[in-house]
């Protein structure tokens, strides 16, 4: 009973408020692990569903192509090296334990402000695509189990919240000449879980 109570409280106090927008540019969500018997009460989700989100059509999956990192390190790179005024080009970043906790979902300022992304290299997908970046180089390694669990949770939430169909959950390579999110990314296994 205590285990389930903690899971319920974790969702109530950490996950739900952050997904519905906070005032800080990068927020953090504790890692979400698959645990049997966890049910997200509909009352909590419906309470926060009254917040308005802009029209989203796609979810675009990326990898950072780096061994380590976090939303703040990518934000710094995007601001200082690429010169992007709004910084972090993604809406969400999922950590691998090297730079941020394994499976930790970090929420970027673009999601909080509901503004256009800078992740797809294509106007349509930057404008209407929610960008999710997993830390790691999936040409060389696979994502961690915690990263995939958090990704599945986040995608399901976004599908429900933004009415995005499964066919519009796409890999960056589907829209741009790139290997992103890497050949070792378990695309088909991910799609089977959605």
Report each predicted region and the residues it spans.
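Bacterial N-terminal signal peptides that target proteins for export
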Residues: 2-11
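Secreted/periplasmic proteins that engage bacterial cell-wall peptidoglycan
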Residues: 51-110, 116
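Basic/polar, cationic surfaces and motifs that engage anionic cell-wall
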Residues: 2, 22-60, 96-99, 104-107, ...
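Bacterial N-terminal signal peptides
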Residues: 10-20
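Soluble, non-transmembrane domains of envelope/secretory-pathway proteins that act on or interact
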Residues: 114-125
């Amino acid at each position: 009973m205590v285990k389930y109570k903690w899971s319920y409280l974790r969702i109530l106090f950490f996950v739900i408020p952050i997904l519905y927008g906070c005032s800080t540019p990068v927020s953090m969500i504790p890692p979400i692990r698959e645990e049997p018997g966890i049910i997200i009460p509909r009352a909590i989700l419906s309470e926060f569903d009254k917040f308005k989100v802009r029209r989203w059509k796609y979810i675009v999956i990326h990898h950072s192509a780096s061994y380590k990192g976090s939303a703040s390190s990518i934000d710094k790179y995007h601001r200082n090296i690429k010169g992007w005024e709004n910084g972090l080009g993604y809406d969400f970043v999922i950590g691998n334990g090297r730079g941020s906790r394994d499976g930790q979902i970090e929420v970027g300022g673009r999601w909080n402000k509901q503004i256009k992304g800078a992740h797809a290299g294509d106007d349509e997908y930057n404008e209407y695509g929610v960008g999710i970046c997993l830390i790691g180089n999936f040409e060389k390694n696979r994502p961690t189990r915690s990263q995939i669990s958090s990704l599945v949770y986040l995608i399901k939430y976004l599908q429900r919240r933004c009415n995005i169909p499964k066919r519009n959950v796409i890999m960056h390579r589907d829209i741009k000449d790139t290997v992103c999110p890497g050949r070792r990314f378990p695309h088909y296994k991910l799609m089977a879980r959605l």
